[in-house]
């Protein structure tokens, strides 16, 4: 299923990713190629240009000859900004906006905006529409 020339979802579903309805994923976004079945994306979520979502980690077990395989969850009505990186095993709640370039290495609760490297919560109480727009900004943390 090709949404348009800039967004592709069906390809990732064929690879085994669990992707909800009305999602848009940039063609340049990278969804884990080694363990695509470990990536779960909720309805109405946007994954923007060159964002990366991982569900495996070779570095932790490289010396012992094994890799870590885990599931990475992204909730409903989320936006993953350009060049953001979601690390393996992270759970991102619903209505979360991940700023461009953020590196998310810990789970994030619902209704937040996260930014930075490592990512931290900068706003709570946000609401994101099903079109990926921030409806309520919430309060600064």
PLM segments and residue spans:
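Membrane-anchoring hydrophobic helices of lipid-metabolizing enzymes
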Residues: 1-21
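Flexible, glycine/small-residue-enriched loop-and-beta-strand segment within the central core
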Residues: 8-13, 26-92, 117-119, 123-134, ...
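Short acidic capping loops at alpha-helix termini that bridge into adjacent secondary structure
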Residues: 21, 43, 76, 94-95, ...
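Beta-rich strand-turn-strand
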Residues: 82-106, 112
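Conserved beta-to-alpha transition
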Residues: 109-110, 124
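Acidic, glycine-centered active-site loop in nucleotide-sugar glycosyltransferases
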Residues: 110, 115-118
